[in-house]
Amino acid sequence: MENLGRSFSFMFEDEDWFQKILIGAAFCLLSLVLIGIPFVLGYLLQVARQSSHGKELPLPAWDNLGDKFVSGLLFFVIGILYSIPLTIIYFILVFIPCIGWLAIIFIGMSFALILPYIAVRFARTGNFGDAFDLSGMWGFLKANLGNLLIVWVMSILFHILAWFGLLALLIGVLFTYFWAQLAVYYLYGRVVYEAERTGIPTAVANT
């Protein structure tokens, strides 16, 4: 997968990167009481959409907050709906001796592998139902499994790095956490972009 290195630093090439990441960190702080979550998710969906079309910069502006809130809230609900069957599977497996920890890994990996498809498809169309196109999702997963595994590993790495913000107390955590999310959603878009560029079927609406 190309541009892995870019995911660490592309955001810092935006002329207003500090201001945009600082605002994102502020919304992350509000996310501690849930209020900021839709705004953060709405912004990240824009990043994924841009990346899926091969566009890195500029980072989306923090404008049209109403639109960001609505799309982010819908995406949050989508995540909850997906978590229900995954949670049921978890509780079925967790009571089987010796494989409880495997259940946790299985659930986490399963959701991580399908999330790029869900995020980009919803970000492109804004259609709630498009996030539940299971046949398209399965085809995308089979055709892009290698890159999806890379993104999964990279997302773990970014979240580990984000916690180094603890060294700078709470504000540092929020700043590095938002940076990590920008990097992860950038990679979500890149998976789709590279698949479409090389002719691999994605079933992700091209809008």
Model-assigned labels for residue ranges:
Residues 29-53, 94-131, 162-199:
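Selective recognition of hydrophobic, aromatic-rich stretches within alpha-helical transmembrane segments
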Residues 2-30, 62-88, 114-164, 192, ...:
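Interfacial aromatic "cap" segments that immediately flank transmembrane helices
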Residues 91-95, 102, 153, 157:
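Alpha-helical hydrophobic membrane-insertion segments
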Residues 12, 23, 41, 45-46, ...:
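N-terminal, charge-rich interaction modules
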Residues 49-63, 89:
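Membrane-helix interface/capping segments
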